């Protein structure tokens, strides 16, 4: 086995060595990707891997990248084998997954794959050195071994790049080659190639400078499509011979291999040369030029076609020519058709025994060419006992492979000698590999004779041991299912009344933590009530527990489907004639993470009550609807809408209560952390179902209803709430309390409605309060209490005016049928509004509104209404706005004995008061007036209503928080980077961030936020951009606060940083800064239309070698707006400070200090690119350097690469000699900077 492994390794090594040898004068290279045959109407080109299945080509060049820069990316075309529709997001860069796979197949078969830059149809042009260096870095990252997020060939890495260009400048392509070779040197793990395809003309106007200044591995000389007609046979300077002379005399690498470039079909291009006419030239160059490497064919699809009506393909004909021995060649074939190999080996083990082995192998073939490679391997071992063994042998292995094009015969001759004496053993193995490639049309016969040997075994004193450690791996897939069952039963004592009740409870849960399957069953059979709760639950290894259960018994049904850790439902019924129906439904979509090892359920019941039923279902993303409605002479409907994140809960319940019943109901729930439901009716109905969940979203809800009746009644209470807001999540705790006390027959109706929208207008209307009293003495009292808290945002316009309005309407209509009747109504409301949005914690605005009103109405007396309103607004620390508004409205009315109508009292929002009604009662001659008062307040008001005959209370609060953020970044691009992030129309807060980092040419980072009602933050930054940088941040139309920040850091040429905040009603901060820009910097910050406070900061710091710096800062801050609501005037007070500072070592010429040249001035300048100034203006400049002026100083620097900044830092080389003419000085920046 070891011998076979060694032989296979030798075969692979030989093949690899062949694939790396591009200078053996028989190599054939092919261009693939242009599909020239398909464009001529013939068969389309095959996929790349089909050309790598045999030894037809030693290397394949992908053709090609046809454009340098379209929207910042190179453009490439591989015809039918890379789809235009499959591109990387946000670019025109195409994905080529099939080519990725094929490149790896070719490389595994020992065939190198290069990428052509330009191509026959390329619109390619590099016009300056920057284009060349930057493009080299870009194609290395995209196609080579670099790191780029967009890689058309995925993980495949090409083996090099080929320049096939005819546009642009000589210096640009020289810069490209120079940078590429430097990058190659950074990855010594593998060999990368650089090649070019110049025209016949010497010099080539785009490539000769690159060839003379850089070491190219090989050149493919175009012998077609030239101005001289067929091939390179024109003038003296347009022949292949001219390129041989140029390579030997002028190329940087005088050993650069030259390939004869031909087109593969007569219809492919001008200058086609048939194989018959190529034979003489190719054999001549092969015999007489050591630089001749072989033939390059345009392209592989043409080369696979027959030519000039020949039966063979063009590439087959080329191989036949290159494999022919030239009569001028002094080399000899290492194998011919009649030669056989024979070897005899003998091993002497001791004086009396021997082993002899004879093996021979003969092979007959039409050998056209032989490539041989010698391998010698020596292995030395040590044995414990002295042993002398001498053995020798030869083995010949012949392998023949037949393909569509060629027959390949490989013969491996292995000779081994074993010499062992005393304590050392030597094994010498010599292998000879002979490979013959022959066209398919030649018949090859191969005969192999295996060796026959006899042996006598003799034990020796040699001890050999081997140990092989094979690691093992195992995969265990655990599966477990552990059921845990629990059961409970409930019993009931004797019931006084025969009742029926139905309890339905459904809880659906999915547990994401694996524990166990939990079935639970309980049953109870009281006299007339049965409660049963079977619980089933399944737990699989994937930690999902679906549960379901159902039970149906005589009078009561309880169904529970739950994955909860504990559940208890005790209930007791007493003798009442009431039915409570409560239903709660919610859509399921709940994931609960519960860590519990056991489940317990307890149900107990003692029922002496009339029928009662409860059904409930609770889940995390749920809707709970609850509305209790007493039906016998009393009806109450309550609805509330609750929005919290992705959770919506609506609850409703309906109750029907007879006259003589007493019902007390209390319900509270907290979802999703825990949920508890408690109900009671005279005797107690208590239900508890806690649910544990991994999410945290508390939504408390409680309600209670207490009613007492001693006579028949008709009572209707309606409360509705409508909220329209721009928030995406809200949490609304809700409570309702209602009590009714009636001592006589009466009918009362109270209507309370609250509407809230983004304009936040609230109204409260109380109407139609009437009493029909059969007796002479009666009284009615009604109390209205409103209390609400709303967390929202205020709209404060840019002109410093507040558009805050509120309106309320109270209507009182009372009819009396007895002479002694009194009616009293009082109302009070408190509203607080707070906004706290954005990243600025100081951006807090609160609004407190208090209103108190009372109405007293008595027969023959005066009614009065009093209303007081107070407004307080608290803004950021730099701005405090306080306003208090109050109004009092009084109403006096003379009421007849039988009826009284009080005119409407309206509060509407104009900050003025006027009499809107007046009159005189005819019976009493008393006069009455009504006033209208208003205040500039916009608020959200929630109402609590308590009528005379029944009382109820409801309150709600809403809080919302939205934080949409958008971020974009671009990192490490050698050419240009553009990062843009924007947010539009966000009602609460917006954050847009854009950054560009380490871009060598240009960077643009822009961030913008538009139309955000609460707060906006826009940030744009550019870091280490070598040529130009633009950072722009803007925040527009933000009603509360805006922050715009733009910064540029470390830009060597020019920088622009702009930040602006526009029309922000509360506070704005705009900051622009530039740091370390060598040439020019512009920093601009502006704030427009901010009525409260504005801060504009502009800072610029520039330093070179730390000897001079300047800082300019300007700010407008501490702006305060105070307004007088009564007079409608406002005052803005602001203060501004500006400061500047600068420092410098010295001024004018004294800013040059005497020290030796150093290489720490700028680590990113080009090679030998340090900047120095000479003390003597008449100093003679060394070769390769030139005078220039920087910051007013005369400077000597390398002339070729002056003022160049590289993407990758390169340490400067040694400083030029002064030749005794003067002393070098290190440059510093100018001395004085004046603050603007």
From Swiss-Prot:
Is the NAD keyword given for this protein?
no
Biased region (Low complexity) positions are 352-367, 822-832, 1125-1156
Q: Where is the composition biased (Polar residues)?
A: 339-351, 810-821
Give the highest taxon in the source lineage. Answer: Eukaryota
Q: What is this protein called?
A: Chitinase-like protein PB1E7.04c
By its UniProt entry, which InterPro entries does this protein fall under? Cts1-like (IPR045321), Glyco_hydro18_cat (IPR001223), Glycoside_hydrolase_SF (IPR017853), Glycosyl_Hydrlase18_Chitinase (IPR050542)
**Mind telling me which GO cellular component terms the entry cites?**
extracellular region; fungal-type cell wall; fungal-type vacuole
Q: Which GO terms describe its molecular function?
A: chitinase activity
Q: Which positions carry the signal peptide feature in this UniProt record? A: 1-19
Q: What is the lineage of its organism?
A: Eukaryota, Fungi, Dikarya, Ascomycota, Taphrinomycotina
The segment annotated Disordered runs over 326-367, 449-497, 584-625, 804-836, 868-927, 946-979, 1125-1159
Q: Which family is it part of?
A: Belongs to the glycosyl hydrolase 18 family. Chitinase class III subfamily.
The GH18 domain is annotated at 26-325
What keywords does the record list, in alphabetical order? Glycoprotein, Glycosidase, Hydrolase, Secreted, Signal
């Amino acid at each position: 086995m070891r011998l076979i492994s060694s032989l296979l390794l030798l075969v692979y090594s030989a093949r690899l060595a062949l694939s790396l040898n591009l200078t053996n004068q028989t190599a054939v290279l092919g261009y693939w990707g242009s599909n020239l045959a398909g464009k001529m109407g013939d068969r389309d080109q095959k996929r790349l891997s089909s050309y790598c299945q045999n030894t037809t080509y030693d290397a394949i060049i992908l053709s090609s990248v046809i454009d340098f820069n379209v929207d910042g990316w190179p453009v490439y075309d591989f015809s039918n084998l890379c789809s235009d529709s499959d591109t990387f997001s946000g670019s025109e860069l195409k994905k080529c997954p099939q080519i990725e796979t094929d490149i790896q197949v070719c490389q595994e078969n020992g065939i190198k794959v290069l990428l052509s830059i330009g191509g026959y149809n390329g619109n390619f042009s590099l016009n300056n050195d920057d284009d060349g260096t930057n493009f080299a870095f870009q194609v290395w990252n995209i196609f080579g071994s670099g790191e780029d997020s967009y890689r058309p060939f995925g993980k495949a890495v090409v083996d090099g790049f080929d320049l096939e260009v005819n546009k642009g400048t000589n210096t640009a392509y020289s810069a490209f080659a120079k940078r590429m070779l430097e990058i190659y040197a950074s990855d010594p793990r593998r060999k990368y190639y650089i090649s070019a395809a110049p025209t016949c003309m010497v010099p080539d106007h785009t490539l000769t400078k690159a060839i003379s200044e850089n070491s190219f591995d090989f050149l493919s000389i175009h012998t077609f499509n030239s101005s001289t007609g067929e091939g390179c046979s024109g003038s003296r300077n347009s022949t292949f011979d001219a390129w041989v002379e140029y390579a030997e005399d002028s190329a940087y690498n005088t050993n650069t291999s030259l390939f004869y470039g031909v087109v593969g079909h007569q219809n492919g291009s001008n200058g086609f040369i048939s194989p018959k006419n190529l034979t003489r030239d190719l054999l001549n160059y092969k015999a007489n030029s050591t630089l001749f490497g072989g033939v390059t064919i345009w392209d592989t699809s043409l080369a696979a076609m027959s030519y000039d009506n020949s039966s063979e393909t063009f590439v087959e004909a080329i191989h036949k020519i290159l494999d022919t021995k030239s009569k001028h060649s002094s080399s000899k074939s290492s194998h011919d058709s009649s030669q056989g190999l024979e070897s005899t080996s003998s091993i002497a083990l001791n004086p009396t025994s021997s082993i002899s082995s004879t093996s021979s192998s003969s092979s007959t073939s039409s050998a056209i060419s032989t490539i041989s490679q010698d391998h010698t391997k020596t292995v030395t071992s040590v044995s414990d006992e002295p042993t002398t063994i001498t053995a020798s042998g030869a083995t010949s292995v012949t392998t023949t492979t037949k393909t569509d094009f060629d027959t390949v015969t490989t013969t491996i001759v292995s000779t081994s000698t074993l010499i062992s004496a005393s304590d050392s053993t030597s094994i010498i193995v010599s292998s000879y590999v002979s490979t013959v490639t022959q066209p398919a049309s030649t018949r090859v016969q191969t005969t192999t004779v295996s060796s026959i040997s006899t042996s006598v075994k003799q034990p020796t004193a040699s001890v050999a041991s081997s140990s092989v450690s094979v690691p093992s791996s195992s995969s265990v897939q655990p599966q477990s299912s552990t059921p845990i069952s629990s059961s409970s039963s409930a019993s009931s004592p004797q019931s006084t009344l025969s009742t029926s009740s139905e309890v339905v409870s459904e809880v659906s849960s999915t547990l994401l933590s694996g524990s166990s399957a939990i079935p639970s069953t309980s049953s109870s059979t009281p006299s007339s009530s049965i409660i049963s709760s079977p619980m089933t639950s399944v737990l699989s290894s994937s930690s999902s527990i679906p549960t379901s259960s159902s039970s149906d018994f005589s009078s009561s049904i309880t169904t529970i489907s739950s994955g909860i850790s504990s559940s208890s439902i005790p209930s007791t019924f007493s003798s009442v004639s009431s039915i409570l129906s409560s239903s709660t439904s919610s859509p399921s979509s709940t994931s609960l993470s519960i860590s519990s090892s056991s489940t317990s359920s307890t149900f107990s019941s003692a029922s002496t009550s009339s029928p009662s039923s409860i059904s409930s279902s609770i889940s995390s993303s749920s809707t709970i609807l609850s509305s209790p409605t007493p039906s016998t002479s009393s009806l109450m409907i309550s609805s509330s809408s609750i929005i919290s994140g992705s959770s919506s809960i609506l609850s409703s319940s309906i109750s029907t209560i007879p006259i003589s019943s007493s019902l007390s109901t209390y319900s509270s729930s907290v979802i999703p952390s825990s949920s508890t439901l408690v109900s009671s009716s005279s005797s107690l109905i208590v239900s508890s179902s806690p649910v544990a969940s991994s999410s945290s979203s508390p939504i408390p809800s409680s309600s209670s209803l207490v009613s007492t009746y001693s006579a028949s009644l008709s009572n209707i209470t309606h409360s509705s709430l409508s909220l329209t807001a721009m928030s995406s999540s809200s949490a609304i705790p809700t409570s309702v309390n209602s009590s009714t006390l009636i001592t006589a027959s009466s009918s009362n109706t109270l209507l309370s409605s609250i509407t809230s929208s983004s304009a936040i207008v609230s109204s409260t209307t109380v109407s139609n309060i009437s009493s029909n009293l059969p007796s002479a003495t009666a009284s009615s009292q009604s109390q209205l209490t409103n209390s609400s808290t709303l967390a929202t945002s205020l709209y404060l316009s840019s002109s410093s005016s507040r558009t805050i309005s509120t309106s309320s309407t109270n209507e009182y209509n009372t009819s009396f049928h007895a002479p002694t009747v009194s009616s009293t109504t009082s109302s009070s409301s408190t509203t607080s509004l707070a906004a706290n949005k954005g990243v600025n914690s100081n951006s807090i605005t609160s609004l407190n509104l208090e209103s108190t009103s009372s109405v007293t109405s008595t027969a023959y007396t005066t009614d009065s209404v009093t209303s007081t309103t107070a407004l307080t607004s608290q803004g950021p620390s730099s701005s405090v706005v306080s306003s208090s508004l109050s109004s009092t409205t009084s109403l006096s009315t003379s009421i007849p004995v039988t009826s009284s109508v009080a005119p409407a009292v309206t509060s509407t929002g104009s900050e003025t008061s006027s009499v809107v009604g007046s009159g005189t009662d005819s019976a009493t001659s008393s006069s009455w007036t009504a006033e209208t008062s208003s205040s500039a307040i916009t608020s959200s008001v929630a109402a609590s209503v308590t009528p005379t005959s029944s009382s109820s209370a409801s309150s709600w609060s809403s809080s919302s928080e939205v934080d949409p953020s958008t971020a974009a970044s671009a990192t490490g691009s050698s050419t240009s980077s553009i990062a843009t992030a924007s947010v539009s129309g966000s009602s609460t807060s917006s954050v847009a961030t854009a950054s560009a980092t380490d871009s060598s040419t240009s960077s643009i980072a822009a961030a913008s936020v538009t139309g955000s009602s609460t707060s906006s933050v826009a940030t744009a930054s550019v870091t280490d951009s070598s040529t130009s940088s633009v950072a722009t941040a803007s925040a527009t139309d933000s009603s509360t606060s805006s922050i715009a920040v733009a910064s540029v850091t470390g830009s060597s040429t020019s920088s622009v940083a702009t930040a602006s905040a526009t029309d922000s009603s509360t506070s704005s901060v705009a900051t622009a800064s530039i740091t370390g820009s060598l040439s020019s910097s512009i920093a601009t910050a502006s704030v427009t239309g901010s009525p409260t406070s504005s801060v504009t900061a502009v800072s610029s710091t520039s330093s070179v070698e730390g000897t001079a710096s300047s800082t300019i800062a300007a700010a407008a801050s501490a702006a305060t707006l105070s307004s007088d609501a009564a007079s409608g005037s406002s005052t803005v007070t602001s203060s501004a400070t500006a400061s500047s500072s600068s420092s410098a070592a010295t001024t004018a010429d004294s800013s040059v200090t005497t020290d030796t040249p150093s290489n720490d001035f700028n680590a990113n300048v080009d090679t030998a690119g340090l900047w120095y100034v000479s003390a003597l203006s008449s100093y003679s400049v060394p070769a390769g350097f030139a005078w220039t002026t920087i910051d007013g100083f005369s400077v000597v620097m390398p002339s070729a690469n002056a003022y160049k900044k590289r993407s990758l830092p390169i340490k400067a080389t040694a400083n030029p000699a002064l030749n005794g003419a003067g002393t070098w000085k290190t440059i510093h920046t100018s001395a004085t900077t004046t603050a603007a």
